[in-house]
Every structure is written in C-alpha cells, then in structure tokens.
Regions:
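A detector for small-residue-rich transmembrane helices and their helix-helix packing motifs
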Residues: 1-194
C-alpha cells in the first residue's frame, strides 16, 4: 500500500510537531504541552479554539506518536485511495476537532488529570471512514475483516487508563458519518504486467 500525499502531509506535520516538543522539553510535560496547544484538563480553553487542531498534532511520548503514525500509515491510504486527498484531510480535521470538542465537554463536566492530546480522534475518524468506504466499493473480504478487527481492538484499547474513550468514539462517529456522504473517487486502473 503506497503512501498518499495527504497521509504523508499529516504524518509530516505530526513528526514536525514532535521535533518541536523535543526541542522545547515538552515530552510528558503538561505545562509545556499546554503552551504548544494541548487541551487543558479542566475543559477551559478561553476562546483559544486553535487548540482543537493543535492538540491533534501533539503527542505525549514516542510510543504515543508511533502508535498514531502506524494507524495513519495503515488507514490513511485506504481512505485517500477511495475518496481522495481532500476528503482525507476533511475527515482528519473534522474528526480531530469534534474529538477535541467532545473531550472539552467531558472535562468541563468531569475534570481530568493531565492534558489531552494526540491524533487518535482523527485516526478513529479514518477507521470509521475506511470501514464504510470498503463496503461502499467492493474490496477484498480480508480487508473488511481486518478493519472490523481493528475497530474491536481500538474500542477495547479505549478502556485503558489515560486513553480518551470520548475522543475515540466522537472521531469514529464523525469519520463514519462523513464516509457515507462523500463521493467516491473513480477507481484507479489496475496495471497488469505482460
């Protein structure tokens, strides 16, 4: 599965922000991550709405970054190949912003310990979109099974401590919903070696 331009762009932005985190000593540092754009634990962003986007490009540590970039590498091309680069970017940004908003609402009601950040809302958006898109356009049965397995594992993972279930669920709902309404990209021709 080759990487597409939109997937590569998101990947590049996540890596660039992680390098900024390293340079600023922000790895696992709530105060510095807040300065870079993470979501606060009390749900109060004081009209700093840009945090709904920046939080998606920040990661707590290298493990967190690697998990989200692996998901991007696996799911991004599935969505991008079937729906196009613009749809991929719309799904990522919409799922990430909605996920961040869901987290803020939850934190307003039940304050959390520590900042919220990461691209998992966007990745769950891709997972929901990929599931819909592989059923909208005929795809290999094993890809469908793998995506369903990924959904089950992702939902189980959402129950772990310090993982934002609300962020994952909101991202999944947004990605799934958008994938039902976006136009499918025309199939790419298959190259057959003679």
């Amino acid at each position: 599965m080759r990487t597409r331009i939109g997937s590569a762009g998101i990947w590049g932005a996540m890596i660039a922000m992680f390098l900024v985190e390293l340079a600023r000593g922000a790895i696992a540092n709530d105060a510095e991550l807040l300065r870079l754009g993470a979501l606060p634990d009390n749900g109060q962003i004081h009209h700093e709405y840009w945090r709904l986007i920046t939080c998606a490009f920040l990661h707590w540590d290298l493990r967190h970054l690697l998990l989200n970039t692996l998901l991007l590498f696996l799911l991004g091309p599935i969505v991008e190949r079937r729906a196009g680069t613009m749809v991929l970017l719309i799904i990522f940004l919409s799922a990430s912003v909605a996920s961040g908003a869901g987290i803020l609402i939850k934190h307003e009601i039940w304050p959390a310990e520590g900042v919220s950040l990461g691209a998992s809302g966007g990745m769950f958006g891709f997972l929901g979109a990929a599931l819909v898109l592989v059923f909208r356009r005929p795809s290999p049965g094993r890809l469908r099974i793998l995506l369903i397995a990924a959904l089950i594992l992702g939902l189980i993972y959402s129950f772990l401590p310090n993982v934002s279930m609300i962020g994952h669920i909101v991202g999944l709902i947004i990605g799934t919903t958008l994938a039902f309404v976006v136009p499918l990209k025309e199939s790419e021709p298959t190259v057959v070696d003679a």
